[in-house]
Every structure is written in C-alpha cells, then in structure tokens.
Swiss-Prot record:
One of its GO terms (biological process) is photosynthesis, light reaction. It comes from Cucumis sativus (Cucumber). This is NAD(P)H-quinone oxidoreductase subunit J, chloroplastic. It is an enzyme of class 7 (translocase). The lineage of its organism: Eukaryota, Viridiplantae, Streptophyta, Embryophyta, Tracheophyta. It is a peripheral membrane protein.
Length: 158
C-alpha cells in the first residue's frame, strides 16, 4: 500500500520501498544509504522542514542496523501536519549512512548518539564523536551482540 509521498517519489523516479503505515497512520519508507542524502534534500525542498526525531536500533543479532528519521511538513494554517518515517538500513560491518546534519541541523546530537551507542558512521557529520560514553570505551553498547565488560568502576559519591 502506497501513501501520498511514496506515490510522489515513484512519479519522480526516486528509488525507495514503501513499508506501509504505522499505528498512527504515518507512512514509513525505506531508503538505501546511497540514495538517502539526495532524497533528504528533496524531502526538505518538498516541505519536510522539521526533523522531529532521529534514532537508531539493532534489527537483529548479527543483522542490519537501522537509522530512523521522523519528518514533519510544517505549514502555516495547517492543523494536522503531514508526517513521514524514513528507515535507512546499514550493514553491521562498517555501517555508513550519509549525515543529514546539513539538511536538518537538529540531526546533530541524535546522529552522534546513534554513532556512540551503535557504531553507525554518519558520513560528512561535522562533529561525529562519542557523546555519552568515554572516548576510551570499546564497543557499541546498544548492539544486541555487545558483551558488557566484566568490571564496574565504583566512584566516590562526593
């Protein structure tokens, strides 16, 4: 089942895969990593001017990693803005997805957090470095195959 945006993308020859609708009726699309930056720019020009959220998750142990973008088309005088969910999947080994920081500045910290927790490298992100874990931390804590270290540092509460 295709929504309005998916039909528009097909009409303009833009490669994607419709994943249907979520429980709120929001259209969900899958975009290939190599197509993501150009489609992000097109979506911004089309009117999706607000990146509501970005997150990432590990699809399955040993499987793909996903970066998820919730975009909103905010227009003056519209009570119910149009929304879309974009999923970009990346291989577990050397996962790379183009950053959309230069399209939506609000992608800055969420992409850094996704990098820090899952190891997804966002190409052309200006400050991609660990944001929650220490720089010396080894591994990606939110991956399903992550093995927690056998040590815990007890710090003085004062």
């Amino acid at each position: 089942m295709q929504g309005n945006l998916s039909s528009w993308l097909v009409k303009h020859g833009l490669v994607h895969r419709s994943l249907g609708f979520d429980y709120q009726g929001i259209e969900t699309l899958q975009i290939k990593p190599e197509e993501w930056h150009s489609i992000a720019v097109i979506l911004y020009v089309y009117g999706y001017n607000y990146l509501r959220s970005q997150c990432a998750y590990d699809v399955a142990p040993g499987g793909l990693l996903a970066s998820v973008y919730h975009l909103t088309r905010i227009e003056y005088g519209i009570d119910q803005p149009e929304e879309v969910c974009i999923k970009v999947f990346a291989a577990r080994i050397n996962p790379r997805i183009p950053s959309v920081f230069w399209v939506w500045k609000s992608a800055d910290f969420p992409e850094r957090e996704s990098y820090d927790m899952l190891g997804i490298y966002y190409d052309n992100h200006p400050r991609l470095k660990r944001i929650l874990m220490p720089e010396s931390w080894v591994g990606w804590p939110l991956r399903k195959d992550y093995i927690a270290p056998n040590f815990y540092e007890i710090q003085d509460a004062h």
